[in-house]
Amino acid sequence: MMRWGRKKPVSSSSSSGLSRALPVSWFSKLSGSSDLKPAKEKKQDEKASQNISVKTSLSSTTRRSDIHENSKRFQRVSVEKENSATRSADKESNEKFEEIMSSVRKKVRDFQKETCGFLEVEAMDRDNGTVILTPRIQVNRDKQRCERRDQRLLEQKPKRSEQDAGVKVKKPARRTGTGGYSREDSVILGHTITKPAHQWEKLKEVKLREVKLKADQQRKSLYLKRELNRIGTKENNKVRVFSPRASEKCRVKAIEDLKKAKQRAREHELLIETADGGMENESFAVVKCSSDPQKDFRDSMIEMIMENGINHPEELKELLVCYLRLNTDEYHDMIISVFQQVHNDFNFH
């Protein structure tokens, strides 16, 4: 039979053993859990510190790379600016030089068209050298020779005009591809043989006298014909060549021909003046045997600049035109390169 009531009391020994075991186990568990927690926290702290150090190192490397790239970019920009400035300066100087060269080439082409009949000086090899032409001041001997030639022409021309009663105005000699000019209008290496003013006046007076004589004869013949017609001869309504109108035309034509001849002589003088770059008319080309044409061209240009006091680009341009006209096409590139060097050395603006 079961008894209802209180439970049996537990013995004191068992209860004391449990009481001893329970606190120890709980403390050991608590201490174990407390020991585990700091270790985990330490690991987490170490990982966080490692991540932070990695991040800081990455950020520092990215900053350094950015700074390096920025410095490189700045250097590139500065170099590009300097290059663009030098390019613009070079371009400006090249444009100025090209402008000068284009005007010079145009003048040379115009001169070659107008003076295609200039006497050509053939290049000769002397001691394996090259013959070049440079402008110089003419010596007195050549000047005297040309003056004597002009005097002979002055003496010969009035005799011809007096002997030939029906003389006509002489047309200027045509210039052939390799031929020369007429004797009166010839141009020899920069010197022009021209007629003085008093000679032109004499020729003009002679021509006017001839025209007046012809007009008087025509008027007399016309008067005689009219008298014959009055007597009873058959009238003719056609305009005769002896009419005053025809004589007036002949007189005007003679004066115009004289003016044209004088104008041609003046044009030749102007051509030689422009060829000499504004220097004296009495200049000529010196034929020189050279083993180094480039050096000789440079020395000659510098000498001409110093002697004539050339200090403007226009005067230097005229000097270049003179060199290009005097020499053949094979030396033109060399002359232009030497001109560019001299232009840069003297710093013409």
UniProtKB/Swiss-Prot annotation:
Residues 37-48, 63-94, 143-167 have a biased composition (Basic and acidic residues). Residues 1-20, 29-94, 143-183 are annotated as: Disordered. InterPro entries: Ovate (IPR038933), Ovate_C (IPR006458). Residues 49-62 have a biased composition (Polar residues). Disulfide bonds: none annotated. Pfam families: Ovate. Residues 10-20 have a biased composition (Low complexity). Residues 286-345 form the OVATE domain. Keywords: Nucleus, Repressor, Transcription, Transcription regulation. GO terms for cellular component: cortical cytoskeleton; nucleolus. It is found in: Nucleus. Expressed in roots, rosette and cauline leaves, and flower buds. Disruption phenotype: Embryonic lethality when homozygous. GO terms for biological process: cortical microtubule organization; embryo sac development; negative regulation of DNA-templated transcription. Interacts with BLH1, BLH2, BLH3, BLH4, BLH6 and BLH10. Plants over-expressing OFP5 show kidney-shaped cotyledons, round and curled leaves, small rosette size, late flowering, reduced fertilization and round seeds. Transcriptional repressor that regulates multiple aspects of plant growth and development through the regulation of BEL1-LIKE (BLH) and KNOX TALE (KNAT) homeodomain transcription factors. Required for embryo development. This is Transcription repressor OFP5. It comes from Arabidopsis thaliana. The lineage of its organism: Eukaryota, Viridiplantae, Streptophyta, Embryophyta, Tracheophyta.
